[in-house]
UniProtKB/Swiss-Prot annotation:
Gene: lsrG
HAMAP family (UniProt xref): LsrG (MF_02051)
Protein name: (4S)-4-hydroxy-5-phosphonooxypentane-2,3-dione isomerase
Its biological purpose: Involved in the degradation of phospho-AI-2, thereby terminating induction of the lsr operon and closing the AI-2 signaling cycle. Catalyzes the conversion of (4S)-4-hydroxy-5-phosphonooxypentane-2,3-dione (P-DPD) to 3-hydroxy-5-phosphonooxypentane-2,4-dione (P-HPD).
Chief localization: cytoplasm
Species in which this protein is naturally found: Escherichia coli (strain K12)
Keywords annotated in UniProt: Cytoplasm, Isomerase
Pfam families the UniProt entry points to: ABM
């Protein structure tokens, strides 16, 4: 299982817009055949910080995800909302 944890920091006045933009990516992602989990988490201490927990069955499923319209649209819209680049950490999922 291929797991990615993404940290996204957005401008404080863009939190609601971020949630709506990312909702579309979430709804599309959970429909993908290779997607096992796609959680959008908001930091309770920093309202403008989000974590995305993505689990896919393999790297091919991740590669497919990055070709989808919902992913491409989301990434394009995120640029103006973020305070800096996304931070990604990769993991091998052992026990889902």
């Amino acid at each position: 299982m291929h797991v990615t944890l993404v940290e996204i920091n957005v401008h404080e006045d863009k939190v609601d817009e971020f949630i709506e933009v990312f909702r579309q990516n979430h709804l599309g992602s959970v429909q993908e055949e290779g997607n096992l989990r796609f959680d959008v988490l908001q930091d309770p201490e920093v309202n403008s910080r989000f974590y995305i927990y993505e689990a896919y069955k393999d790297e091919d499923a991740v590669a497919f995800h990055k070709t989808t319209p919902h992913y491409k649209t989301c990434v394009a819209k995120l640029e103006s909302l973020m305070t800096g680049p996304r931070k990604k950490r990769l993991f091998n999922g052992l026990m889902p």
